[in-house]
Regions:
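Functionally constrained cores in energy, signaling, and assembly domains
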Residues: 10-11, 28, 44, 55, ...
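Extracellular/periplasmic carbohydrate-active domains that bind, remodel
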Residues: 1-2, 11, 15, 34-36, ...
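The right-handed parallel beta-helix/beta-solenoid scaffold, focusing on the short coil/turn
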Residues: 26-28, 37-39, 45-47, 57-59, ...
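A mid-sequence interfacial segment
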Residues: 86, 96-97, 102-105
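Short loop/beta submotifs within extracellular cysteine-rich repeat domains
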Residues: 57-58, 76-77, 95-96, 114-116, ...
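Feature marks extracellular polysaccharide-active and adherence modules
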Residues: 31-33, 42, 52-54, 61-62, ...
Length: 238
């Protein structure tokens, strides 16, 4: 395993060290991260990188196939526009984790901020903790799983994908509804939880799109006055 125990202070130096180890095909361990932005951005290749310390914004953005383990907290936009690979955070994450995610997995073993999975199109986000407001806003696809509580406007303007919340939901956003998970959902959840060694008694609610096209989009495009009762199903009490 490539190992760098000395403290490195600049984003440029850290990323150079990571790429140098990746060229050798070696697993890499970096220590001394102190909040630098844009660490491990745009990496390609089936290599595992362990980073110890506090990451700034855009950690692991544009990831394509690399496994990143962060032993510490992350700033905003963790894994932004990631296409494949895996990011595990053994700590908390700030706002916007998994924004515009296309594929791969993001696992946060702690609480996270707001707007998790905004604009997400595929892949998986698992958060073993609570999240802030606007979870899954503008969600197009993929799965988001929260073992704790969620804030306001969950699933606002979502048109696809699934959001699973085990705890309390402060409020649903426009175009979102909450249902009880079906048999296939329960099997999927069991597989997700078992894979991450998350054990316990879970009672998830499933949040999905109420309409195929968000109400705001229809109003804006056609100048129509549409009543909220357009959908046949109403969200269950949460």
């Amino acid at each position: 395993m490539g190992y760098m125990a000395e403290t490195i202070y600049t984003t440029r130096d850290i990323n150079r060290a990571i790429r140098a180890q990746m060229k050798k095909g070696a697993a890499t361990r970096i220590e001394g991260l102190t909040g630098q932005d844009n660490i491990a951005v745009g990496l390609e290749g089936d290599v595992k990188i362990t980073i110890i310390g506090e990451a700034g914004d855009f950690f692991g953005a544009l990831n394509c196939g690399t496994t990143l383990l962060l032993k510490g907290n992350s700033g905003r936009f963790l894994g932004d526009t990631m296409s494949s690979g895996k990011i595990v955070v053994e700590g908390k994450a700030s706002d916007g984790a998994g924004a515009n995610l296309h594929g791969g997995e993001i696992i946060i073993k702690g609480n996270a901020g707001g707007r998790i999975g905004v604009g997400m199109k595929g892949g998986m986000i698992i958060i073993d903790g609570d999240v802030g407001d606007e979870l899954g806003v503008n969600l197009f696809g993929g799965d988001i799983l929260i073992t704790g509580n969620a804030g306001k406007n969950v699933g606002r303007s979502m048109t696809g994908g699934n959001i699973f919340v085990n705890g309390k939901i402060k409020s649903l956003g426009e175009n979102a509804k909450a249902l009880k998970p079906g048999k296939s959902d329960k099997l999927k959840l069991t597989n997700f939880l078992t894979k991450q060694n998350l054990m316990g008694e879970f009672k998830f609610k499933k949040v999905i799109s109420k309409r195929e096209i968000p109400l705001d989009t229809i109003k804006s495009a056609f100048g129509m006055s549409i009543k909220k009762g357009l959908a046949n199903e109403e969200p269950e009490d949460i």
